[in-house]
Amino acid sequence: MANHSSAKKVVRQTIKRTLINKKRSSAIKTFIKKVMYEISRGNKEDANLALSVAQSKIMQGVKKNIIKLNTASRKISRLSRQIKNLHKSE
C-alpha cells in the first residue's frame, strides 16, 4: 500500500483509468460482435453499416491507446474480408 499522498493519488488515477479503459474496450468488442451477428445473418447492407460504426469505434480506441494500430487494422481487415466473401457467396 502506498504511504505518500502522491503515491496514493497515482493509485487512485490508475484505478480510474483502468475502469475507463475497460469500458471502452468492452464497447469496441460489442461493436465487433454486432458486425459478426450481421455477417452470420447474411445481411450485407446491415453488415456494412455495422462495420462502418465498428471501424470508427476501433480507430477511436487506437487514438485512446486502448488497442494497438496493427491490431485494429487486422480486426477491420478481417471483418471487411468476411463481408466481401459474403457478397461472393450469393
Swiss-Prot record:
| An example Gene Ontology CC term for this record | small ribosomal subunit
By sequence similarity, the record places it as follows: Belongs to the bacterial ribosomal protein bS20 family.
Which BP terms from GO are recorded?
translation
User: Source taxonomy lineage?
Assistant: Bacteria, Pseudomonadati, Pseudomonadota, Alphaproteobacteria, Rickettsiales
Q: Which Pfam families match?
A: Ribosomal_S20p
Role summary? Binds directly to 16S ribosomal RNA.
Return the protein name.
Answer: Small ribosomal subunit protein bS20
Please name the InterPro entries in this protein's record.
Answer: Ribosomal_bS20, Ribosomal_bS20_sf
Organism for this UniProt entry:
Rickettsia typhi (strain ATCC VR-144 / Wilmington)
User: Which keywords appear in this protein's UniProt record, sorted alphabetically?
Assistant: Ribonucleoprotein, Ribosomal protein, RNA-binding, rRNA-binding
Gene Ontology MF: a single term: structural constituent of ribosome
Q: Which top-level group of life is the source organism from?
A: Bacteria
The record's annotation in HAMAP family points to:
Ribosomal_bS20
